[in-house]
A protein has these predicted regions:
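Non-catalytic, conserved peripheral segments adjacent to functional cores
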Residues: 1-96, 113-147
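Short beta-strand His + acidic residue motifs that chelate non-heme Fe in jelly-roll/DSBH
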Residues: 100, 108-113
Length: 147
């Protein structure tokens, strides 16, 4: 199993069954992992497609997968970190319904797993600002996506 990256928070979320439609909790401002609200957005990814690598210098990500299944991979290249040079991966879905909080300064990429729609919600700590993030091509950080 991958080692949990320093600063990552994994929070189990409530799902409430209701005969007219289920309720999926996301985040409260009193939750661990809430570092302010900048914006919330949804993003979809097709099966076996991969988006990333991206590193934020100001934005904390809070990722939830209410539809489909997505594998998230985090890589820590922070020299001062106890988890320097480690990877952490997790698949989130309705069956593994959790919020993944990703701190600033680590690399993140994700892959669509389900045949149907794979959708994530990011509850971001700041509004989108393209100058606070760095990107790399997938082959610049070596990770075995085929497991």
């Amino acid at each position: 199993m991958d080692k949990m990256i320093e600063g990552i928070i994994l929070t189990p979320l409530k799902q409430i069954n209701h005969p007219k439609g289920d309720i999926y909790h996301g985040m409260k401002k009193s939750d661990n992992g809430f570092f302010g609200f900048g914006e919330a957005y949804f993003s979809t990814i097709s099966k076996n497609e991969i988006k990333g690598w991206k590193k934020h210098t100001e934005m904390v990500l809070n990722l939830i997968v209410p539809v489909g299944e997505i594998e998230f991979v985090i890589y820590d290249d922070r020299l001062e970190s106890a988890t320097f040079n480690n990877f952490f991966s997790i698949k989130l879905s309705q069956n593994n319904y959790k919020r993944l909080t990703i701190p600033i300064g680590v690399w993140m990429a994700f892959k669509g797993i389900s045949e149907e729609t794979n959708m994530l919600l990011n509850i971001a700590s700041i509004e989108h600002n393209p100058v606070e993030a760095f990107t790399k091509e997938l082959d610049e950080i070596k990770y075995n996506w085929i497991k």
